[in-house]
Regions:
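A short small-residue
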Residues: 2, 20-24, 94-101, 189-197, ...
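Acidic/His- and Gly-rich active-site-bordering loop/insert found
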Residues: 2-104, 109, 113-133
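General structural feature for long, well-ordered alpha-helical segments within catalytic domains
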Residues: 3, 14-21, 34-45, 72, ...
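Divalent metal-coordination and catalytic microenvironments
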Residues: 25, 76, 108, 137, ...
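Short Gly/Pro-enriched turn/cap motifs at secondary-structure boundaries
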Residues: 54-55, 175-179, 364-368
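Histidine/acidic-residue-rich, glycine-tolerant segments that coordinate divalent metal ions
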Residues: 63-64, 83-85, 92-103, 109-110, ...
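Non-cysteine beta-strand/loop elements that form the S-adenosyl-L-methionine
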Residues: 75-77, 190, 386-389
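Metal-dependent amide/peptide-bond hydrolase catalytic core
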Residues: 211-456
Length: 456
């Protein structure tokens, strides 16, 4: 194993540049499909460090950067999209930096930069020691929406020997838990408009169809397999009450423990939509917006990450960083703080501290209700992930608190630690062929043919 302290020192020497990239992207958040500036920052940076950059046509702002030759292909995935309406200053009070603007409440400014640290550090040490191997950085836009599914379908990840990534969180742990599969789609109902007071009999209400469809989903819930969740909103309910609505729409999310459960559920949902139109003499169409498979962790890589995370020195917070973390933590309700730890089996007594300053190993055998586009990649190649405590304990993703924390100096320290861990793990994979062999053996033993949940 490469000396972890040596790797950490190399990363520390470039800390101003890495922190600057993370802060720059945090200060200039771009939502899914609009990450032109953010992706350009990474492409230009990687090109300047000797990586060859290839942009992918199937998805705007997606790319691959590669450096090195021969040996195994060790890849890292980086994200950089922000969330709409989540603007927040780096402070302990809810205060948008720009009202209604996006913000990095999922910490993707950190995720992309941390994976950049890993790719550059691994490429440096492999070349310095004359070790063969290709290091890749995949730029993955729109994680909060469509995700990297077009890249998976195009086979962009298929020839990688191992892929790793990470995410900001409130604990330091390998990501052993699985995620839920999902599909999101809009059901659009078409009726016939008429005057609701003068000639209601001449109209056919698309809103009636949408409401009957939604009611059918409510009655269906009881008879779905455990773990299947339905969430919906009426995204179009008509324009005025005195017009029989010609158009209406329901925006629906379907979640399931594993991807192969989605098609059967969707067959029943399609029947419900058809039934609603028969009752109202309307018609319907549907538009699939996104879909993600469940994440299937490769435990050979997860075990390696846990081993490495125990050797790379954890960062130390300053007094100011600890004070900031305490102030942010205090803005989260006591019960809400537990919601970040309980799903992955982390002990709740961790909440006595503002920052997780030790190494955990949580989530084995657990599944979270959320969905990750990393899941689709894990169906085609061995994938491992880790979490780093970029946020105070009890602070969850997609909150103003996580957005504030993601712009802090502590978050940048945790980001560099995560990148260092990923680099050291990549070095182990590149130099110990038995690890790659074992990871692939595990992958093949559990392999399920890939089918996107969008392919209904």
């Amino acid at each position: 194993m490469i000396n972890p302290e040596k790797a950490a020192s190399w990363v520390e020497a470039g800390s101003a540049e890495y922190d600057g990239i993370a802060r720059d992207i945090w200060e200039h958040p771009e939502v899914a499909f609009h990450e032109e500036r953010s992706s350009a920052i990474y492409e230009e940076r990687l090109a300047s460090k000797g990586f060859s950059v290839t942009e992918f046509p199937e998805m705007k702002h997606s790319f691959m950067a590669e450096r090195g030759s021969g040996g195994p292909v060790i890849a890292y995935m980086g994200e950089y999209d922000a969330l709409p309406g989540m603007s927040q200053v780096c402070g302990p009070v809810k205060q948008p930096a720009s009202e209604g603007s996006p913000g990095h409440a999922c910490g993707h400014n950190l995720l992309g930069a941390g994976s950049l640290v890993a790719a550059e550090a691994l490429a440096h040490f492999l070349e310095a020691e004359g070790i063969p191997g290709r290091v890749r950085y995949y730029g993955c836009p729109a994680e909060e929406s469509l995700g990297r599914i077009p890249m998976v379908k195009a086979g962009r990840f298929n020839d990688a020997d191992a892929i790793m990534t990470w995410h900001g969180a409130d604990v330091n742990t390998p990501h052993r838990y699985t995620s839920s599969a999902n599909v999101s789609l809009v059901f659009s109902f078409k009726g016939r408009a008429s005057h609701a007071g003068m000639a209601p009999q001449a109209g056919r209400s698309a809103l009636d169809a949408a409401q009957l469809f939604n009611i059918s989903l409510e009655f269906m819930r009881e008879h779905l397999s455990p773990g299947i969740l339905l969430h919906y909103v009426i995204s179009d309910g008509g324009q005025r009450p005195n017009i029989v609505p010609e158009n209406a729409a329901t925006f629906l999310y379907v979640r399931a423990p594993v991807a192969d459960m989605i098609p059967e559920v969707m067959k029943r949902i399609m029947k419900a939509a058809k039934g609603a139109t028969l009752m109202t003499e309307t018609s319907f169409s549907f538009d699939i917006k996104a879909g993600k498979c469940d994440y299937r962790p490769n435990y050979v890589i997860q075990d390696l990450l846990h081993e490495v995370m125990g050797t790379v020195p954890l960062p130390e917070p300053t007094r100011e960083e600890t004070t900031f973390a305490k102030a942010l933590q205090a803005t989260v309700g006591r019960d809400d703080r537990k919601a970040t730890l309980a799903p992955i089996g982390a002990p709740l007594d961790l909440l006595k501290s503002p920052i997780h300053r030790t190494l955990g190993d949580f989530g084995e055998g657990k599944r979270i209700g959320g969905s990750l586009d990393t899941g689709d990649v894990s169906y085609v190649v061995p994938v491992g992930q880790m979490n780093a405590a970029t946020w105070p304990l009890g602070v969850g993703a997609h909150t103003w608190q996580s957005c504030a924390a993601s712009g802090s100096t502590w978050a940048f320290k945790a980001m560099r630690w995560a990148g260092t861990c990923l680099a050291v793990a990549g070095y182990e994979l590149a130099t110990r062929s038995e690890l790659i062999t074992a990871a692939k053996k595990e992958f093949k033993a559990n392999a399920i043919p890939y089918r996107s949940t969008m392919d209904l």
